[in-house]
Every structure is written in structure tokens, then in C-alpha cells.
């Protein structure tokens, strides 16, 4: 608590930040506060679920910093002394704005508790972007990192690959909030259901709303995953210059790095985890 006070004090944060939250809640999420006109704006970040008591006794809205959506909190109410208690679920290393007094209409309630409908365990057809050494397509019986592949073209691949599969949904889900949880992604993914773009996931919990695209019965699924170009540079470091797939002004070294000052990549450096790692699940959330 002393550390947090010093940190916020160095940023000229007002003392009311610390009075606005319960001491117990302050240890759960990191937070900051500012006023804009008549609005109180709180930014919170952390992991998991907690109930937070705010000094402001008004009606809160929750603003999602990733997609700009504005919703009512999943649960909120008044305390005996007139303050507002809000229940927030930030997931894994998530963030949200809780805003009081802003002239913004919520689009609905924040997603509630999740229940798994299905996990996709069938083999994936994966099509790799051309020009980076990977085969045109491969079949992944289960989701594994590209950098662990026995095929050097996949192992050192950098770029975008499209994972294709399908899933079935039962009847009776019309009007329900459905999403797809991608599990672990390295580094970012776009989701398409039945050919319709649903959203991009680049940070935990790597979950995309598919409510408008999914239907009862068979659904086609495409997940386009992109990584950084680091692995291809490391792979190219072992190749003669004329056989490399990348062009860069960085120096590439065959073997181990000998200098301590960063100036490029060496062929024996550790590869970055890449690809869709899953598990991929279809999720229903209470609204």
C-alpha cells in the first residue's frame, strides 16, 4: 500500500483514489482515477473477479478498452452508507474502465458467468502464407506450437496461417451470447464463423463474440493466426544469404551470439512460441 501511494503520488494522483476503494479491493486490482467534468473515471487492471466499493454513489457503466463497448456491470448495488459496490471479472490480466456520470447509454449487461458448450478436438487444416518457407498446408491432429514442429518450414515460419475446422451447436441458443475461447494464442488471431468476421484477439483471455455469426447445426470456423518475424530471422541466420526468406539491415549470425550488444539474431537463439495453442472452446455466457 505504501508503494502504491508513492507511485501514484509521483504521478500527481489525488488522495481520493485511495479513499474510493476498499483496502481489501485495492490489493486485488491496480487502479487509477480521474475526473472529467461531472464524470468519475476509474481504470482498473488485474486478474480474476472481485467486488469493489466506490465512493461515488451513482450508477456505473463498464467501458471495455479493447473494443470500446459500454455495458452495465454484471452485478452492482448500494452499500449501507450510500456508496456503490460493483462486481468485476477482469479475466486473466484484463482491464476495464468503471465510469460514473458520463452521458453514455450501455449496450447491455457485461458478459456473466461462462459455461462451456463444446471443445473443438478434431484435426485442424492449416494453410500457411506463402514466401516464408512453410508448406502450403498441413494437418495438425492437435494444436501444437509451430516452433516445435519437425518441419523446418513450420518451425521457423513467420507470418499468418489460417486454421480451419467446424463445430456443431444445438438448437435453443438463439439470442444467447456465444463466444469462442481460443485458449493460448501467439501472437494474435482473427476469427471467422461461417465466413463472417467476428473479431480479433491479441490479449488474454483471447475470446471473441460469435453470437451474430453462429447458428444451430454445423458451423465453419477459420482462425487466422499471426506471429512476429523473429523465428524466420533466426532460421535465416543458419542459411546462406542467397537462400534467406527475409531481407533486413540486421546482422544474422550462424551459431551462438558472440557479442553482448543487440544487433540482430543468431541461429542458435531460442525460438518464440508461435501459433494457435488452444484449447479452443465454444462458450455461452449469461447476460
Model-inferred region functions:
Residues 1-160, 168-172, 210, 281-285:
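Carbohydrate-binding surfaces of carbohydrate-active enzymes
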Residues 40, 163, 176-178:
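Structural beta-strand segments of beta-rich domains
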Residues 103-122, 126, 227-279:
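Glycine/proline-rich low-complexity spacer/linker segments in large multi-domain proteins
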Residues 77, 198-202:
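Short beta-strand segments within Ig-like beta-sandwich modules, predominantly Fibronectin type-III
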Residues 96-102, 165, 220-227:
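Short, hydrophobic/aromatic-enriched beta-strand segments in well-ordered soluble domains
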Residues 52, 167-194, 201, 221-225:
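Aromatic-lined ligand-binding clefts that engage carbohydrates, nucleic acids, or primary amines
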Residues 48, 215-217:
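A glycine-anchored, Pro-Gly-centered beta-turn/N-cap motif
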Amino acid at each position: 500500500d505504501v508503494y502504491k501511494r508513492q507511485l501514484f503520488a509521483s504521478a500527481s494522483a489525488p488522495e481520493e483514489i485511495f479513499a474510493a476503494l476498499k483496502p481489501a479491493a485495492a490489493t486485488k486490482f491496480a487502479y487509477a482515477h480521474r475526473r472529467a467534468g461531472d464524470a468519475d473515471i476509474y481504470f482498473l487492471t488485474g486478474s480474476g473477479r472481485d467486488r469493489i466499493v466506490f465512493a461515488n454513489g451513482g450508477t456505473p457503466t463498464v467501458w471495455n478498452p479493447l473494443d470500446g463497448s459500454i455495458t452495465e456491470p454484471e452485478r452492482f448495488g448500494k452499500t449501507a452508507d450510500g456508496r456503490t459496490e460493483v462486481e468485476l471479472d477482469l479475466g486473466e490480466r484484463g482491464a476495464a474502465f468503471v465510469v460514473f456520470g458520463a452521458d453514455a447509454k450501455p449496450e447491455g449487461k457485461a458478459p456473466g458467468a461462462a459455461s462451456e458448450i463444446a471443445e473443438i478436438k478434431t484435426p485442424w487444416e492449416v494453410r500457411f502464407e506463402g514466401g516464408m518457407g512453410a508448406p502450403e498446408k498441413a494437418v495438425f491432429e492437435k494444436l501444437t506450437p509451430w516452433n516445435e514442429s519437425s518441419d523446418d518450414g513450420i518451425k521457423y515460419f513467420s507470418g499468418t496461417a489460417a486454421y480451419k475446422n467446424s463445430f456443431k451447436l444445438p438448437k435453443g441458443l438463439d439470442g444467447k451470447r456465444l463466444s469462442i475461447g481460443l485458449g493460448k494464442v501467439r501472437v494474435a488471431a482473427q476469427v471467422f464463423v461461417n465466413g463472417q468476421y467476428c473479431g480479433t484477439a491479441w490479449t488474454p483471455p483471447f475470446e471473441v463474440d460469435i453470437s451474430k455469426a453462429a447458428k444451430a447445426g454445423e458451423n465453419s470456423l477459420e482462425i487466422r493466426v499471426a506471429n512476429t518475424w523473429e523465428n524466420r530471422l533466426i532460421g535465416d541466420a543458419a542459411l546462406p544469404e542467397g537462400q534467406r526468406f527475409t531481407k533486413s539491415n540486421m546482422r544474422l549470425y550462424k551459431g551462438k551470439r558472440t557479442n553482448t550488444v543487440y544487433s540482430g539474431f543468431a541461429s542458435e537463439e531460442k525460438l518464440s512460441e508461435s501459433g494457435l495453442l488452444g484449447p479452443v472452446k465454444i462458450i455461452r455466457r449469461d447476460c
